[in-house]
Design a protein with these regions (language model features):
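A short beta-strand motif characteristic of beta-propeller blades
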Residues: 30-36, 72-77, 116-121, 161-166, ...
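Beta-strand-rich domains and repeat architectures in extracellular enzymes and scaffolds
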Residues: 34-61, 304-316
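Conserved loop/turn at the beginning of each blade in beta-propeller domains
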Residues: 38, 79, 123, 168, ...
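Hydrophobic core register within WD40 beta-propeller blades
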Residues: 45, 86-88, 130, 175, ...
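Short coil/turn segments that connect the beta-strands within blades of beta-propeller domains
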Residues: 50-52, 91-93, 135-137, 180-182, ...
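Short loop/turn segments that connect beta-strands within beta-propeller blades
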Residues: 67-71, 109-113, 154-158, 198-202, ...
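Periplasmic c-type cytochrome electron-transfer domains
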Residues: 178, 192, 202, 216-244, ...
Length: 615
């Protein structure tokens, strides 16, 4: 009865809710989320040169201009179906946004008081971040699934061309122009990768990695000597017991400071203690990938954790402002970063922008469709600016998405589902949990992209119910309170929206007719896949099957039978097998001779890899 009353009161609250925005409060309505009226979901914001307006880019494909003094949206422009990132170049008065649905870089400018599209250029899929050069004549775009960065040269404000496209050993996420104005730091979107791109030479200068994953933001310290990162560290050898989670022993939320001089060196720096069981040296091209030494600042304490740190800025008087995305808070430190004051904001705060005088900060509340206006010192919320004129009732999948990114599901708020399954994919790390009903044999965190069609679940294939697996993960991995049936339904609804990742080949050739894979080799590889029996375990259409198999691998507890993971999007995985012991498809087939009754020749292995890289 209480639950029914709670639902009734919630519905009544929705009906009478009035918000301020582009329409008057009297016109405010409740609407079902649809293609015509979706939640805005702000993903990026910038402050204009005179400090009077905010430019806010939203996942629903719109860019909004917000008047700061009146705290209202004064213009909304439809750019595409979905945007992922945006950056303002103040001197050029140009706003570059990324159309992640159609894979374009779009240039906007204010003309006669209105935002106007000036140019757009195709980029590899899936563009997720960009930076401008200091002079505003170039942009660098990170394309996630293509595992590439693309240097774009602007020809005035109405056209552009691609100057160079560079491949990476990881899926790129965040970018930042370094103080020398020549080099750009490139962060891994999921795992522990870092790179430095030399904009003058149009090539990679450095390949490195950190002890961590989920690099959510990059910033430069006030003295311009340190690159700051918000990220997480998953301790693969710590079982997810209640005490371990409570004391922060399973997953840590941190700000890491990397000395820029070390980052820009030739890579001869000393190695730090590496949390990964797969070693700390890798080779990409002719570059050795070393762990970059950094100073780690831990966020959160038992009973009051700081799950999923995101946006980050540092002021000239040495105050650090960090967005605690998973617990809906912003933390503002004292001078010298000795302690933080936390203030509550909207749901899933992500991006942050600082006013020129550093007295105000503006924060995107992604799931509240709003901007929080903060006073830096003393720390407090001054106002909340709504981005939509009506309250849109979330769908089941949208409620599930909110739960997926909510660190409060875990004990003390240490981590969310997203913390390990980054944006529904994987952080490429190992975790020792009770998914397989035992501790002592850490397993690779699987991607959840396409997961609704790959039953059974867990590495040993012991779960046939996605609802039960979700409930078990929250209670025994996250050590949170039990999730009810409605919450399980909502999370399942969200997981059903997650499609398998695009292959690297498809992402790189999205706008190009040039084949990145030999079609003859692909046909030959498909034939080998079928004739060699790979298809027996990795059956079409999802390239998996319901059984578990002994393929000559054994975990630490003696288990030898494992359920085969789907091979859809396998090119987007940094490590393979249940424990990540293989670092590439070539290693799987050549060194481990996986699934081969008869040894394949080098030519056959290459053809099979070409096929697998395409699916």
């Amino acid at each position: 009865v209480r639950q029914k009353l709670a639902i009734l009161y919630t519905l009544i609250a929705f009906i009478f809710l009035m918000t301020r925005g582009e329409t008057s409060a009297a016109d405010s309505t409740v609407a079902k989320s649809s293609a015509a009226e979706k939640r805005a979901v702000p993903v990026a914001l910038d402050i204009t040169n005179n400090g009077t307006q905010l430019l806010v880019s939203c996942r629903n494909g719109t860019v909004k201009r917000v008047q700061i003094d009146s705290r209202e949206v004064i213009e909304t422009v439809n750019v595409s179906q979905q945007l992922s990132a945006a950056k303002l170049h103040i001197a050029q008065r140009a706003y570059a946004v990324l159309d992640t649905e159609n894979n374009f870089l779009v240039r906007l400018e204010v003309v006669d008081g209105k935002l106007k599209q000036m140019a757009k250029i195709a980029v590899p899929a899936k563009p997720v971040d960009l930076v401008w050069s200091q002079d505003g004549k170039r942009c660098l775009v990170a394309s996630n699934w293509a595992r590439q960065i693309t240097a774009i040269q602007w020809n005035g404000n109405s056209s552009a061309k691609s100057a160079a496209t560079v491949e990476l050993p990881f899926a790129p996420g965040k970018l930042i122009l370094l103080p020398d104005q020549r080099n750009v730091a490139v962060a891994d979107a999921f795992g522990n990768g870092m790179a430095v791109f030399d904009w003058q030479e149009l090539k990679l200068k450095r390949i490195a990695k950190i002890d961590g994953h989920n690099i959510s933001d990059l910033a430069i310290s006030f003295d311009k000597k340190t690159l700051l990162l918000t990220h997480q560290v998953l301790y693969y050898d710590k079982g997810t017991t209640r005490p371990a989670v409570h004391w922060g022993g399973v997953l840590a939320n941190v700000v890491e400071g990397i000395d820029l001089e070390s980052l820009l060196s030739d890579g001869n720096n000393s190695l730090t203690g590496n949390n990964s069981p797969t070693g700390n040296k890798e080779i990409f091209g002719n570059k050795e990938r070393l762990t970059v030494p950094g100073k780690v600042y831990f966020l959160g304490i038992p009973d009051e954790a700081a799950g999923d740190p995101a946006g980050l800025v540092e002021t000239s008087d040495e105050r650090r402002i960090v967005v605690y995305s998973g617990v809906n808070q912003v933390a503002i430190s004292d001078r010298g970063v000795n302690f933080y004051n936390r203030i509550g904001v909207g749901k899933r705060p992500t991006k942050i922008a600082l006013s020129a005088n550093e007295e105000r900060a503006y924060v995107c509340n992604s799931f509240s469709d709003s901007i929080s206006v903060l006073q830096v010192n003393p720390a407090k919320v001054l106002a909340t600016i709504p981005l939509t004129g009506q309250t849109v009732e979330p769908t089941a999948s949208e409620r599930g998405e909110e739960l997926f990114f909510n660190s409060k599901l875990a004990q003390d708020g240490w981590f969310s589902c997203h913390s390990c399954h980054t944006n529904g994919h994987t952080n490429h790390q190992l975790n020792d949990n009770l998914g397989d009903d035992s501790f002592g044999a850490p397993k690779r965190v699987p991607s959840l992209l396409g997961v609704s069609k790959t039953a059974p679940w867990t590495w040993r294939g012991t779960s046939n119910s996605l609802h039960q697996q979700i409930a078990k993960s929250v209670e025994l991995t996250m050590r949170g309170k039990p999730v009810d049936k409605l919450q399980q339904d909502d999370i399942v609804a969200y997981l059903k929206t997650l499609l398998p990742p695009m292959s690297v080949h498809a992402a790189r050739s999205f706008h190009s007719r040039r084949a990145t894979i030999d079609p003859v080799a692909v046909r030959k590889g498909r034939s080998i896949f079928r004739k060699s029996g790979c298809v027996d375990c990795h059956s079409l259409p999802n390239y998996t099957s319901a059984d578990s198999y002994d393929v000559g691998l054994k975990d630490e507890l003696g288990n030898t039978k494992f359920n085969p993971p789907s091979l859809l999007g396998v090119s987007q995985r940094d490590n393979l097998f249940h424990d990540g012991r293989a670092g590439s498809l070539k290693e799987v087939l050549k060194e481990f001779r996986h699934g081969q009754d008869r040894e394949l020749s080098d030519e056959q292995i290459e053809a099979l890899i070409q096929f697998l890289m395409r699916i």
